[in-house]
Curated annotation (Swiss-Prot):
This protein's record includes keyword ATP-binding: no
InterPro entries assigned: (+)RNA_virus_helicase_core_dom
Example GO biological process: symbiont-mediated suppression of host innate immune response
One GO cellular component term noted in the UniProt record for this chain: host cell cytoplasm
Subunit-level organization: Homodimer and homooligomer. Interacts with capsid protein. Interacts with host AGO1; this interaction targets the host protein for degradation, thereby suppressing the antiviral RNA silencing.
The species this protein was found in: Potato virus M (strain Russian) (PVM)
Protein name in UniProt: Movement and silencing protein TGBp1
Gene Ontology terms, MF aspect: ATP binding; RNA binding
Keyword RNA-binding: yes
Length: 229
């Protein structure tokens, strides 16, 4: 247990529980470094194996990478399960990693460690997210720009969470990715296209769409207004 706890401290996770029992539950914001932490754990200690309910890693020469969760776990290994909040039932494993804000599931468990600092996007995005009710921090700099949906062309990777918006984009010949297609993905520049002026229909979906970028987030919405409801 010490090896994973030491890594959590290394990656600046905050400990909430004095007594740790299995499963160790770790919650963090997008870009906190949980995938990097898990990969480092696999390289450090062969007793561990890792699975994800999201997008699996590419195979590695070591033969030990974050694989897609199939519901089966090997004997004699300490199993780490990433993106556990995407599941409806949580298996008995050694450690669980996830972001309950990105999920509407009832499977969320009480956290032993948390991290609210993102290394992916920057302080401008975090300022917007805090205004919308999400506690996310960053020491990086980035750009956020909110524009009217009909007056500005999208930049970078275009994403959406509402089906009618996807239909509108396709009708105009705009290549765009749905919520399901961006899970586990990161892009330099993202344009989030929405019919809303605040995240009401599906807050978790809007949160995911606004946390996929590294350097710039553009939001295209009616009247160039996107604020808390």
């Amino acid at each position: 247990m010490d090896v994973i706890v030491d890594l959590l401290y290394k990656y600046k996770f905050e400990r909430l529980s004095n007594k740790l029992v299995c499963p160790i539950v770790v919650h963090c914001v997008p870009g906190a470094g949980k995938s990097s932490l898990i990969r480092e754990l696999l390289e450090l200690d062969s007793r561990f194996c890792a699975y994800t309910a999201g997008v699996e890693d590419q195979p590695r020469l070591s033969g030990n990478w974050i694989r897609k969760w199939s519901g089966q776990q090997p004997e004699g290994k300490f199993v780490v399960l990433d993106e556990y909040t995407l599941l409806t039932e949580v298996p008995p494993v050694f450690a669980l990693f996830g972001d309950p804000i990105q999920s509407n599931t009832s499977a969320v468990q009480r956290a032993d460690f948390v991290c609210s600092v993102s290394r992916r996007f920057g302080s401008a995005t975090c300022g917007l997210l805090r205004e919308l009710g999400w506690n996310v921090r960053s020491e990086k700099a980035d750009l956020v720009q909110v524009s009217d949906i009909y007056t500005k062309d999208p930049l970078g990777k275009v994403v959406f969470s509402e089906e009618e918006v996807g239909c509108l984009l396709r009708s105009h010949g705009v290549e765009a990715l749905s919520l399901q297609e961006i899970t586990g993905q990161t892009f330099e520049v993202v344009t989030f296209v929405t019919s809303e002026n605040s995240p009401v229909i599906n807050r978790a979906a809007a949160y995911q769409c606004m946390t996929r970028h590294r350097t710039a987030l553009h939001i295209l919405c009616p009247d160039a207004t996107y604020t808390a409801a």
